[in-house]
Swiss-Prot record:
GO biological process, alphabetically ordered: ribosomal small subunit biogenesis; rRNA processing
Record InterPro entries: PRC-brl_dom, PRC_barrel-like_sf, RimM, RimM_N, RimM_N_sf, Transl_B-barrel_sf
Domain notes: The PRC barrel domain binds ribosomal protein uS19.
Coiled-coil zones: none
Family matches, as NCBIfam families: 16S_RimM
The organism's place on the tree of life at top rank: Bacteria
The protein, known as: Ribosome maturation factor RimM
Record-level Gene Ontology MF annotations: ribosome binding
Lineage: Bacteria, Pseudomonadati, Pseudomonadota, Alphaproteobacteria, Sphingomonadales
Subunit description: Binds ribosomal protein uS19.
Domain spans labelled PRC barrel: 91-167
Length: 169
């Protein structure tokens, strides 16, 4: 994908302590990618420090945040950087944000849903897909590993899943 859409590296989930630190949910690229940047959201937030919370997230301090009350107001804020600030992708690589929102179809051409999230539990990335159509009892999802056996191809418009990995109704 070659658009200019900023990429989200983390989301603020709440305050941590009384000095204005915030808890972060790391998205896709992890703590090291976050540490590589000092400015987020077009310069509105300046990172002073960041460390692991030892639970898969992080604790960060921003120069503009002076106390718990200000930190709480940032809950739900995503931390974005310009796409050009990240390293170029090699063949077969992707940013999580590039997959989210893609239509999901089987290799037989049947539309099965839309990518709503990407997870990584250590072994490989896992794509979470919301089924089409949304059932009366609420959204149903299924997960597919981002392996060559499960995901046949992807581009800026869709992700193609091997039929064996597309969960039937």
């Amino acid at each position: 994908m070659t658009d200019n859409t900023p990429l989200t590296l983390a989301a603020i989930t709440g305050a941590h302590g009384v000095r204005g630190d915030v808890r972060l949910k790391l998205l896709g690229e992890g703590l090291e990618a976050l540490k590589a940047h000092s400015s987020f959201n077009e310069g509105t937030l300046t990172l002073k420090s960041v460390r692991s919370d030892n639970k898969g997230g992080a604790i960060a301090r921003f120069a503009e945040v002076q106390g718990r009350e200000q930190a709480e107001k940032l809950r739900g804020t995503t931390l974005t950087v310009p796409r050009e600030a990240l390293p170029p992708l090699e063949e077969g690589e992707y940013y999580f944000a590039d997959l989210i929102g893609l239509d999901a179809v089987t290799d037989a051409g049947k539309r099965v849903g839309k990518v709503i999230d990407v997870h990584n539990y250590g072994a490989t990335d896992i794509v979470e897909i919301a089924k089409d159509p949304v059932p009366e009892k609420g959204m149903k999802t299924f997960m597919v590993p981002m392996t060559t056996h499960a995901v046949v191809e992807w581009n800026g418009e869709r992700i193609v899943i091997a039929t064996d990995f597309a969960h039937p109704d």
